[in-house]
Amino acid sequence: MRKLLFRSLKDIRRIAPQSLIMQVVCMMLQSVLVAVNTWLVSVFLNHVYSKDLKISVIYLGIIWGIFVGSEVANSVFYACMVKIDSKVGMKLAIELGEKGGRLSLIQYEDVEINNRLKRAQNCIEHGRFSDLSLSIFNILAEILKVGSTLFILARFSPLLALVSLLSVIPYFIVRLIRGKEFYELKKYQSAGERRRNYLYHLFGDKRVVKELRIFGIESYIEEKLYQTRDEMNQELWDFKKRDICSFSLCEILCKCGYMLSIIIAILLLLNHKLDFGMLAASLMAFSSFQLAAKYFLISLGRLPECAAFVRDYYDFIDIDEDVRGREKFDSNFDKINVKNISFSYPNTDYLAISNISLDIKKNESIAIVGNNGSGKTTLVKLLTGLYKTQKGEILYGVQNINNFEPVGFYRNVSIVSQDFVKYEMTLRENIAISDWKHLNDTDKIQELLKQMNLPEFSSKEALDILLGSEFDGRELSIGQWQKLAIARGMFKNSSMIVLDEPTAALDPIMETTILKMFLKIAKEKTAIIVSHRIGICREVDKIIVMKSGKVVEIGNHNELLAKKGEYYQLYKMQQKWYVE
């Protein structure tokens, strides 16, 4: 745990060094002032008892000044804590996102990776780094307070020091046990929390709400949500009951210790071992010691809990990343050569892609077709390096895709997927965000809008219209959003573009119309279209037919019809959708 504590403090110092230094200064000042104030009270009361009013007033002013100084230091301390929480939370959230971007796409198919990500996000959202640093500072501050007040108590009476120590030890034991229990509970509940959040967000997703109402399944989803919530709440309530009972017992023992200290102090006074000022100061010191020791032991016992939550963040940050290539991508390749590749998803025992070999020439237009589950999307992810082959190789010219430096490679690749993003931004941003350095290339944006048959948006004024209903912008039809997604892919100056069923939600005729526009625009690019419909297949140079993870046929439209194989069967089933 020591390495974890140093690592977390190092990150806090890296992000907010000035605030951290101010916290240390304020913490030390507060801690020392407690002991100084206790001693001053003893001196002040003795002067009052001896009726030395002039000196008493001076000491009273000093005591008041110490109280004010302590409060100012406390306010500055927590102001710095708020600043640290804000800066550290934002910076670590960004670094968490950057780490997620460096993981391979296939790693997100692993449930454990997703659970780690959820716990890491919770660590940031709930301010666990601030909790940990606060616990560390509390421990250091209370050590100074405990040491200084214990020194004063021991000067008054060693017995008072011993009683004060024994009265606060139960806090440490309870906090240590309950802290570990609470972390294990939250770790156990992480999967349930993901499920609960998913069900909850269904009611806020306007794409889902319509279906919930039409099918009348709101009550069913609500029941599942309440069931998940109630199970988690019951587990949490059971823990809280144990926690409350344990701390109530600790409070009782602490109060018993304080009463015992009063009795001991009175006996010492009666035996002339304490004077009046020392009596009051010893009781004040005992109370301060109990409070400081209590918070010290609570913070110390809570430290493993806080550290465990922070460890969740580093558990995700420390996930091994794929070794990235360093080879510069040569966009002048003559063809893409796929040699005997196979691939399976994590935690499965079947091949999603099985022993596929094929060639794709540069600037060739390709349609990959097949029924759902045939492996089309998986093949495209392998061709674009989003997944790595487990067997075989993919060559761009003579270069192996696994050796490419990713940033350089992806500058030359555009992908428009079925679950394309609807950016709640301006029309200009929706298109040019794929190559944002050319955001102000108005002529290119307008030309793409015309080519995608969206002339109503091609004026300069329309480019700055906010789209989407989230921020009171203009809502578009699904067809318009899909055309913008394709335009976004085309705006990027890439040598290869892939459409992975982005028009699947459209009717076959509209889909074919949009894809014909796409092929016309992309005639000087390597264009790959993935679809389970065959309407566009007449327009492409080559058709790849897939079934059960294998390529079963390759050829053009007429060649494959003549074979009367898998493509022929698909064509016969779908030909009624298209106008000949």
Predicted regions and their residues:
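ABC-type nucleotide-binding domain
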Residues: 330-580
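Cytosolic ends of transmembrane helices, especially the final helix of ABC transmembrane type-1 domains
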Residues: 217, 241, 261, 280-317
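Membrane-integrated ABC transporters
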Residues: 1-33, 54, 58, 77, ...
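Hydrophobic alpha-helical transmembrane segments of ABC transporter permease domains
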Residues: 29, 33, 37, 50, ...
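Short intracellular "coupling" helices and adjacent cytoplasmic loop segments at the cytosolic face
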Residues: 95-127, 189-224, 315-326, 346, ...
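An intracellular "coupling" helix at the cytosolic face of ABC transporter transmembrane type-1 domains
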Residues: 14, 121-132, 184-191, 201-204, ...
